[in-house]
């Protein structure tokens, strides 16, 4: 073979270098939105990733981690408050010449879940190779190079490997471990390949178990380990296949309960996911996903458990914190009265002043704050420009920027005082009360109607999927000179996390509680003024304000273990749901079973309904979804099966009777929700016609389980009357 010319060699060398540069490019995708409402009402005004944590915007900790991880390109996927995030980044050090990576903000305004964001990411074609997927609320000092090396090793060994989860070992009851969404990982003990994932109920003294489909273990040879001692910060190293899988499965909304579980149980994808577990006790990793973890991580930062992520590292340009004994941090230009006492684990920002006789410990004070005389502040977080007047007591509370607390005010544990709120003198704010400057009116997740409110202003929820909020200024709460409205979200009313933050406090002081069903006439908005011909356009009704997310236990009577259609059919549909089979495959298997066992379509409808209800209850009792979210998710995805199981008006009525029967034996905390959303979903999907719904209703008994559905029936009847009136007018 003739020797290569110098020109050919130079060209090939240049090509190789160019390829190496491409291969070395390491991208990071940051999900700036959590798509949750746990930090409402504050996140109605500012994005969670810009809320201050130890006087540093939360996203700075994530970007610092990415800088140490060797990332070259960072894409910030922004939805809620995207303009604020973009403005902050443009004025930050990360846009300077010395930034270790390039930063691009992607306006993913329409995204309403992690799944939507991943599908948007796939559509944009930004991913060049393996990338790091991380939430914008992560605080960690881990050595990422070890995790990346583990990922590359597994990728070389396993051609089906598509992702590596980066997990941190800790006690199951560790305070930074999620108590909202805890989970167990079933791993191959030798390789750390994830075999199964299951959400588990929050620690409550109840026993729980992990149910694994034996089919998942058919090809497995080795030893399994069940890990309930891992902190999952949602830090993942992903291949380009991950966004593509979200694209192919449009119903995937969540990273773990949908994507991870779906991949592991799919008999079509045949992809593998591994877990890198950091066992180094010096490595810290946590997510600020709730008020309790906000408190815990703040205290860990002050106590220097997150070193070098500590206040005196001055992560943000312009910060000037210095460290003193007992974990006290001070910026310059602060004024401390001679008789004030600054206790352990306290940080005070620039230009803040503290009056005579005031005591502060285990707290963070922002910049330009004014703290009066004889004030007591413990385990609380005061943000920039806040004013706390004389003789006030704050315990485990949040006071947002520009808020004012009057003289002789007591903030009980769990209090959240929103931006610009004013609390008058001599007031006591009860446990867990949240106060906002103005009422919040938002579009609910069904997207159709809003409840009436005294304000015309609208603010977006943290995740864009909000629930209407009752808000009325209460002089008893904020005082004559005060400014603010009690805030209580229907979603949050069932959230136990606030109680965690305050030490099992209660909601006794809330002005408006929404823990029980709210079935007021005002809950239903009027139908559009446009003429609607009967059956030509299906009406849409939002009933979100009528539903709370109280849950309860479900006990099922399994009956005899016989090989009959009841058992086989139920197992078939359940397996289809768990493994996320396509609808046609599930129906084919079920129909084959029906013919082989010579049963009626009534039996088919019965086992299908039972399987759907069982999955809804599973979501609820494991704390994975609220009753409303669970019923909506299952009926919307799998209710379409009934279109090929009902063929006459009588069978439509029979289906509704079955759903009512299955719902009636559920826990009373959510059985009405399951029945109502089942009926409404079947109507929306045109599985059952309006007249057959009314026939079912009129023929049945007025049981308690029908209470919530009654409003839907009333709406149907009134809308039908309007149609009749319009038809009469047209005929005239």
Curated annotation (Swiss-Prot):
Gene3D superfamilies: 1.25.40.180, Hexapeptide repeat proteins (2.160.10.10), Spore Coat Polysaccharide Biosynthesis Protein SpsA, Chain A (3.90.550.10)
TM regions (residue ranges): none
An MF annotation (GO) of this entry: guanyl-nucleotide exchange factor activity
Chief location category: cytoplasm
GO terms under cellular component: cytosol; eukaryotic translation initiation factor 2B complex
Keyword list, A-Z: Cytoplasm, Initiation factor, Protein biosynthesis
SUPFAM superfamilies, alphabetized: ARM repeat, Nucleotide-diphospho-sugar transferases, Trimeric LpxA-like enzymes
Top-level taxon: Eukaryota
Pfam families found in the cross-reference section: LbH_EIF2B (PF25084), NTP_transferase (PF00483), W2 (PF02020)
Coiled coil: none
Record-level GO BP terms: cytoplasmic translational initiation; translational initiation
Entry's localization field: Cytoplasm, Cytosol
Domain W2: 559-726
Oligomeric form and interacting partners: Component of the translation initiation factor 2B (eIF2B) complex which is a heterodecamer of two sets of five different subunits: alpha, beta, gamma, delta and epsilon. Subunits alpha, beta and delta comprise a regulatory subcomplex and subunits epsilon and gamma comprise a catalytic subcomplex. Within the complex, the hexameric regulatory complex resides at the center, with the two heterodimeric catalytic subcomplexes bound on opposite sides.
Family, per entry: Belongs to the eIF-2B gamma/epsilon subunits family.
The protein's role, per its UniProt record: Acts as a component of the translation initiation factor 2B (eIF2B) complex, which catalyzes the exchange of GDP for GTP on the eukaryotic initiation factor 2 (eIF2) complex gamma subunit. Its guanine nucleotide exchange factor activity is repressed when bound to eIF2 complex phosphorylated on the alpha subunit, thereby limiting the amount of methionyl-initiator methionine tRNA available to the ribosome and consequently global translation is repressed.
Record protein name field: Translation initiation factor eIF2B subunit epsilon
Source organism (scientific name): Candida albicans (strain SC5314 / ATCC MYA-2876)
Taxonomy of the source species: Eukaryota, Fungi, Dikarya, Ascomycota, Saccharomycotina
């Amino acid at each position: 073979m003739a020797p290569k010319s110098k020109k050919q060699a130079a060209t090939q060398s240049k090509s190789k270098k160019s390829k190496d540069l491409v291969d070395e490019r390491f991208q990071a995708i940051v999900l700036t939105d959590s798509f949750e409402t746990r930090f409402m009402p504050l996140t109605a005004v500012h994005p969670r990733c810009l809320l201050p944590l130890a006087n540093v915007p939360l996203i700075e900790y994530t970007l610092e981690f990415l800088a140490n991880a060797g990332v070259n390109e960072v894409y910030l996927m922004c939805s809620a408050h995207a303009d604020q995030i973009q403005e902050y980044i443009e004025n930050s050090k990360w846009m300077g010449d010395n930034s270790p990576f390039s930063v691009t903000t992607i306006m993913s305004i329409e995204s309403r879940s992690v799944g939507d964001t991943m599908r948007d990411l796939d559509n944009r074609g930004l991913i060049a190779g393996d990338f790091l997927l991380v939430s914008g609320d992560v605080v960690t000092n881990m050595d990422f190079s070890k995790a990346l090396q583990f990922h590359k090793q597994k990728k070389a060994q396993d051609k089906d490997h598509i992702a590596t989860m980066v997990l941190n070992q800790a006690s199951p009851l560790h305070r930074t471990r999620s108590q909202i969404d805890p989970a167990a990982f079933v791993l191959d003990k030798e390789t750390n390949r994830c075999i199964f994932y299951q959400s588990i109920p929050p620690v409550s003294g109840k026993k729980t178990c992990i149910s694994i489909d034996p089919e998942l273990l058919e090809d497995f040879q080795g030893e399994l380990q069940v890990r309930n001692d891992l902190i999952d910060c949602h830090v993942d190293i992903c291949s380009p296949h991950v966004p593509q899988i979200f694209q192919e499965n449009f119903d995937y909304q969540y990273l773990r309960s949908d994507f991870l579980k779906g991949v592991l149980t799919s008999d079509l994808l045949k992809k593998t996911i591994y877990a890198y577990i950091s066992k180094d006790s010096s490595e810290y990793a946590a997510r600020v996903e709730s008020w309790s973890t906000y408190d815990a991580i703040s205290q860990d930062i002050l106590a220097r458990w997150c070193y070098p992520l500590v206040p005196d590292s001055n992560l943000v340009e312009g910060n000037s914190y210095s460290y003193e004994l007992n974990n006290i941090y001070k910026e310059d230009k602060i004024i401390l009265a001679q008789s004030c006492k600054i206790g352990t684990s306290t940080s005070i920002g620039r230009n803040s002043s503290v009056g005579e006789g005031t005591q502060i410990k285990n707290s963070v004070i922002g910049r330009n704050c004014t703290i009066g005389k004889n004030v007591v502040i413990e385990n609380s977080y005061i943000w920039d420009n806040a004013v706390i007047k004389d003789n006030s007591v704050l315990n485990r509370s949040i006071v947002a920027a520009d808020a004012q607390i009057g003289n002789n005010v007591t903030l009980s544990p769990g209090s959240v005082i929103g931006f610009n709120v004013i609390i008058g003198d001599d007031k006591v704010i009860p446990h867990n009360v949240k106060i906002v400057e103005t009422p919040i009116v938002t579009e609910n997740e069904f997207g159709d109607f809003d409840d009436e409110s005294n304000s015309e202003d609208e603010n977006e929820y943290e995740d864009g999927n909000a629930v209407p909020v009752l808000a009325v200024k209460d002089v008893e709460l904020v005082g004559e000179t005060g400014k603010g409205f009690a805030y209580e979200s229907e979603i949050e009313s069932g959230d136990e996390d606030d109680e965690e933050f305050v030490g099992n406090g209660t909601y006794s002081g809330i002005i408006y509680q929404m823990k029980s069903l709210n079935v007021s006439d005002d809950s239903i908005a009027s139908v559009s003024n446009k003429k609607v011909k009967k059956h030509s356009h299906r009406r849409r009704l939002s009933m979100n304000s009528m539903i709370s997310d109280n849950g309860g236990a479900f006990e099922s009577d399994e009956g005899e273990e016989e090989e009959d259609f009841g058992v086989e059919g139920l197992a078939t549909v359940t397996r289809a749901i768990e493994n996320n089979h396509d609808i046609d495959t599930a129906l084919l298997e079920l129909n084959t079973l029906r013919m082989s066992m010579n049963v009626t379509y009534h039996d088919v409808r019965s086992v299908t309904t039972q399987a759907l209800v069982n999955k809804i209850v599973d979501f609820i009792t494991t704390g994975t979804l609220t009753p409303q979210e669970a019923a909506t998710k299952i009926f919307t995805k799998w209710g379409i099966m009934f279109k090929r199981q009902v063929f006459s008006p009588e069978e439509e009525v029979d289906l509704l009777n079955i759903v009512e029967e299955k719902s009636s034996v559920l826990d009373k905390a959510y059985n009405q929700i399951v029945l109502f959303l089942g009926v409404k979903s079947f109507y929306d999907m045109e599985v059952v016609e309006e007249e057959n719904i009314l026939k079912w209703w009129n023929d049945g008994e007025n049981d308690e389980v029908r209470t919530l559905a009654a409003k839907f029936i009333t709406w149907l009847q009134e809308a039908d009357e309007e149609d009749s009136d319009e038809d009469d007018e047209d005929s005239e």
